[in-house]
Amino acid sequence: MTAGPATVEDGGAADASFAQRYYDLHPVYRLGLRWGFIIAATAGAFHQSLLSLIEVTRNGSLGGYVWTVLAAAILVAFAVARRRRTELPIHDRQTDIIVGLMAMGVGILIQWVLLPRYDLYFLLLRLDLVAMWLFVTSSAVLLFGLRPVIRFAWVWGMLLMVFPLPYYLAVLTFGGGKTSAGAATLLISGVGAGIAMGTTYRRGFVASVAAWVIGFALLAVITIFLHEAPLLVYQQVPALAALCVVGAAG
């Protein structure tokens, strides 16, 4: 007769012990565990999208620029994280859960409803990447809270550049070809530099211009001396190198 309550108490004690061990960890380890969980969940939920993106990149398609967006966003996030925190240490878990679940619901609707509806334009729109963005963002809200996510709002906004249609239009506007693809990705590095260094509007503008100047110089070198380089080199090297140089100089 006493087995039931004892079992419940044992289960509660086990949960409390697990929570205590988790919160006893160094904050860096807790941060790593949370991001590890988000990455694993995203890889499991969107493995087909990731495999498709890898295949597109291996085939030398324009869609490989998405990796440049991801790498640039990670670099910019590190720069933003180094700034002095200004938000109040207030956390409302109910709001976090509501906002996180709503965003995740929208992502699920895009993945399950809109994606099949616009299957003919899959490579042009890549709505699955938009759904993945919503999944990661909502997971971050649920695990970290809304205020910490808002602190990196510009970085999250930058990650929306994985929606490929504007990039494709920019490449066509610049004339098409590998050099045009590289020039279009410099828009990513310019935006990233402005966010990373933009403690003021003036600093952000100067950083963006500097990233574009350095990026176009590197792109010219690749076009002239390494003309046969793969498309991914045109898309990644000038943009990421310019972002790193501006970040180091700042």
Feature locations, PLM:
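Hydrophobic N-terminal alpha-helices or hydrophobic patches in metabolic proteins across all domains
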Residues: 2-250
